[in-house]
């Protein structure tokens, strides 16, 4: 009997990550902003990257390596921005906030869709629109706390 009980506690468990159903009460749209800025930066780098002459195998390999790295970072950061926005939307904002921000759901929905677009496309327009959407969410978030926190970007 003891062995069965012990076995039930030592099995393979999937690791769950969360922010934060404790609830910790620590929320800030800055993490979404930083991720969106990184995705925008990678989008610009991808668009600026010049393909080498196809006859130079070493330069072509370096180009593909750099392009792949930029794409991976862009996709990771767009996904991270989406995760952070969804946390704010579903964990921080409450029905009472809809009175003050009637467009809250639409704003977050559009921002989440932009995260997906930035992830799968190389669109300077969508990457910029995502940062603009997060700026709007930043304003709502800090207004909901009756605080005036200036918007800024790190880049």
Positions of PLM-derived features:
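Short, solvent-exposed, charged loop/turn and helix-capping segments
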Residues: 84-101
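A generic short-segment signal for beta-strand/edge and adjacent turn/coil regions
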Residues: 7-8, 79, 96
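Heme-based O2/NO sensor domains and their adjacent alpha-helical segments
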Residues: 74-82, 86
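Alpha-helical scaffold segments that form or flank carboxylate-/histidine-based iron centers
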Residues: 65-77
